C-alpha cells in the first residue's frame, strides 16, 4: 500500500504567505533575540564558576555545562533548581548521555524573566 506524508496544504499556503509577505518583523525578532542572547551570556559570564558555555550563533537555546560537583547529575540539578530556586530548566540528560552535566536554557523570553531566573540561580549558589 503506497503511503506518503506531507505538510497539510493549508500550512504550505501559510508558509508561502509568510515568506512572500512583509519581512519587517524578522529584523525585530532578530534584534530581540540577539539582545536576549547577549543578556543571557552576560549573566552566565557572571556565574563562570558554575557554568561554562559557548555563545550560540543560530539558536534561541543554550546548553551550558554545569561545573559544580552536583551538576554531574543534570536531572537532580534541575530538580533542585526548580524546587529551591523556582527556575525551570531542562536537564541535559534528556538529550542523551552526552548531555549529562549540562542543562538547556531558552532565551526566547522577556528580559526580565532572564534576569529573574539568574538572580535566583545566583542566590542559590553564590
Where on the chain are the PLM-derived regions?
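PLP-dependent class I/II
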Residues: 1-126
Amino acid at each position: 500500500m503506497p503511503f506518503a506524508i506531507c505538510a497539510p496544504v493549508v500550512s504550505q499556503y501559510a508558509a508561502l504567505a509568510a515568506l512572500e509577505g512583509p519581512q519587517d518583523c524578522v529584523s525585530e525578532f532578530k534584534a530581540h533575540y540577539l539582545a536576549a542572547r547577549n543578556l543571557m551570556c552576560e549573566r552566565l559570564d557572571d556565574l563562570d564558576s558554575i557554568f561554562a558555555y559557548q555563545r550560540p550563533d543560530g539558536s534561541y537555546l543554550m546548553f551550558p555545562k554545569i561545573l559544580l560537583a552536583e551538576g554531574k547529575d543534570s536531572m537532580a540539578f534541575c530538580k533542585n533548581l526548580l524546587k529551591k530556586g523556582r527556575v525551570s530548566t531542562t536537564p541535559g540528560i534528556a538529550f542523551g548521555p552526552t548531555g549529562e552535566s549540562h542543562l538547556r536554557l531558552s532565551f526566547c523570553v522577556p528580559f526580565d524573566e532572564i534576569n529573574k531566573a539568574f538572580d535566583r540561580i545566583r542566590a542559590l549558589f553564590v
